[in-house]
């Protein structure tokens, strides 16, 4: 992939950009095999990759510069701002949005937050696009609600310029720390969730719910999990750390009992909406801590699917899964190091199948799906 920002030394986020994709995949596969070297693996499936540019459905832009000339991008470690509107990871559809946002910031008087001076209001612009209909969700992350009335007043102009903006919100993040969002979300549109669709499964994205940033590869990840589950004798499963329900909604069948657990209420609201649309009455989604839920249950499902954050599922949940002993565990991980550590804590299981998904091209990161079977 050619990137003018990288060539000019202005951005180094894509550390592997100079390597061809096949070389990147080989290096990632070697890393994964090294991490799982102590475990016999029955089947290594071929790695899955997607487009090498224009694949991201989300932009997280630090706002800097002045209210008249805002910059959207990032801050270097020394505080120097960098405009990343031309980043080739973004689809072409993002360019007109960034172009309209810059004059809008001036119109609404949204002074960019100055980290050094601890002054200003607009900290971040967060943009998400649906692959199914091109609709977009735009979030303004502000230090306070001081400029909220001005923003509301100026908003009709922006909506006229960009009718694709279906969901618009203000998030209040008052603390002087590099935290992307605060707890308070104020909706400026009637619509509160963005409609998405992977493999004919309706999914919903709300402002504070996690959603994969590479739809082309994520849809293949969910479809693969569905195929693996369909090959197993499973009538009852848990989907832990389920997010908006991507895995569970793909894997569920009308006669399957499925419980999805996620700590974020926003994500659970999305999952419930999708389940209702699909008419899947035996699906339950609850906003709880996954470990606390699992350890409080008396019943044992045949399959537990886990999709934890980078820290992994941790020893308490590993210990409980070992005791509870479901016949199958499917582990989806964005950090193979913590996954390998967790598998070490599950000695009663063997690795049946592993597949790497290149969710993050041009970086060392990847997603991996692993099927564990009780020994």
Swiss-Prot record:
What is the reaction catalyzed? uridine(747) in 23S rRNA + S-adenosyl-L-methionine = 5-methyluridine(747) in 23S rRNA + S-adenosyl-L-homocysteine + H(+)
**Transmembrane region(s):** none
Top-level enzyme category: transferase
EC numbers for this chain: 2.1.1.189
Which of this chain's residues are annotated to bind [4Fe-4S] cluster? Answer: 3, 11, 14, 87
Instruction: Identify the catalytic residues.
Output: 334
Q: Which UniProt keywords apply?
A: 4Fe-4S, Iron, Iron-sulfur, Metal-binding, Methyltransferase, rRNA processing, S-adenosyl-L-methionine, Transferase
**Mind listing the GO molecular function terms for this protein?**
4 iron, 4 sulfur cluster binding; iron ion binding; rRNA (uridine-C5-)-methyltransferase activity
BP-aspect Gene Ontology terms: rRNA base methylation
Per its UniProt record, what Pfam families does this chain match? tRNA_U5-meth_tr (PF05958)
Binding positions for S-adenosyl-L-methionine per the UniProt entry:
212, 241, 262, 307
Which family, according to the similarity comment? Belongs to the class I-like SAM-binding methyltransferase superfamily. RNA M5U methyltransferase family. RlmC subfamily.
Summarize the protein's role.
Answer: Catalyzes the formation of 5-methyl-uridine at position 747 (m5U747) in 23S rRNA.
- Designated name of the protein: 23S rRNA (uracil(747)-C(5))-methyltransferase RlmC
- Native species: Escherichia coli O6:H1 (strain CFT073 / ATCC 700928 / UPEC)
Please spell out the taxonomic lineage of the organism that makes this protein.
Bacteria, Pseudomonadati, Pseudomonadota, Gammaproteobacteria, Enterobacterales
């Amino acid at each position: 992939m050619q990137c003018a920002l990288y060539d000019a030394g202005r951005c180094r986020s894509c550390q592997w950009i100079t390597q061809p994709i096949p070389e990147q995949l080989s290096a990632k596969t070697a890393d994964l095999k090294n991490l799982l070297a102590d475990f016999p693996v029955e089947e290594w499936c071929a790695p899955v990759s997607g487009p090498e540019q224009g694949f991201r459905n989300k932009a997280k832009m630090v706002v800097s510069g002045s209210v008249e000339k805002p910059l959207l991008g990032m801050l270097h470690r020394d505080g120097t701002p960098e405009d990343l509107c031309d980043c080739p990871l973004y689809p072409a559809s993002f360019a007109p949005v960034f172009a309209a946002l810059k004059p809008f910031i001036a119109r609404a008087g949204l002074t960019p937050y100055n980290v050094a001076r601890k002054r200003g209001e607009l900290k971040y612009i967060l943009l998400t696009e649906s692959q199914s209909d091109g609709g977009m969700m735009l979030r303004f992350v502000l230090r306070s609600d001081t400029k909220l009335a001005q923003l509301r007043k100026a908003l009709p102009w922006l909506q006229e310029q960009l009718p694709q903006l279906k969901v618009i919100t203000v998030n209040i993040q008052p603390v002087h720390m590099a935290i992307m969002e605060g707890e308070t979300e104020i909706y400026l549109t009637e619509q509160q969730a963005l409609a998405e669709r992977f493999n004919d499964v309706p999914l919903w994205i709300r402002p504070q719910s996690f959603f994969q940033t590479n739809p082309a590869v994520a849809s293949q990840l969910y479809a693969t999990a569905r195929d693996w589950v369909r090959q197993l004798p499973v009538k009852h499963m848990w989907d832990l750390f389920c997010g908006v329900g991507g895995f569970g909604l793909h894997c569920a069948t009308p006669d399957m009992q499925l419980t999805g657990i996620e700590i974020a209420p926003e994500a659970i609201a999305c999952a419930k909406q999708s389940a209702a649309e699909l008419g899947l009455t035996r699906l339950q989604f609850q906003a709880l801590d996954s470990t606390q839920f699992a350890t409080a249950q008396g019943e044992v499902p045949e399959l537990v699917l886990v999709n934890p954050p980078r820290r992994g599922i941790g020893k308490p949940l590993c210990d409980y899964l070992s005791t509870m002993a479901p016949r199958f565990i499917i582990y989806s991980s964005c950090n193979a190091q913590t996954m390998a550590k967790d598998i070490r804590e599950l000695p009663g299981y063997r690795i049946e199948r592993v597949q790497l998904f290149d969710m993050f091209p041009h970086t060392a990161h990847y997603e991996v799906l692993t099927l564990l079977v009780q020994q």
